[in-house]
Amino acid sequence: MDKKLLAMLACPVCKGELKLNDARTELICYQDAMAFPIREGIPVMLAVEARTLSTDERLDKH
């Protein structure tokens, strides 16, 4: 994902910062403990499509 695009995106729930996961398949909001999928290169920024981070993922902030 383009760094400029990532810098413009915000969590749709809290408007906080998003981080790209190591596999580059999800955008992570650590504040809300949510992971938004990236499908075919397009971020799916819908809370209903997000998954909740596991406890280990919450502790493994980058």
UniProtKB/Swiss-Prot annotation:
It comes from Marinobacter nauticus (strain ATCC 700491 / DSM 11845 / VT8) (Marinobacter aquaeolei). The lineage of its organism: Bacteria, Pseudomonadati, Pseudomonadota, Gammaproteobacteria, Pseudomonadales. Belongs to the UPF0434 family. This is UPF0434 protein Maqu_1739. GO terms for cellular component: cytosol.
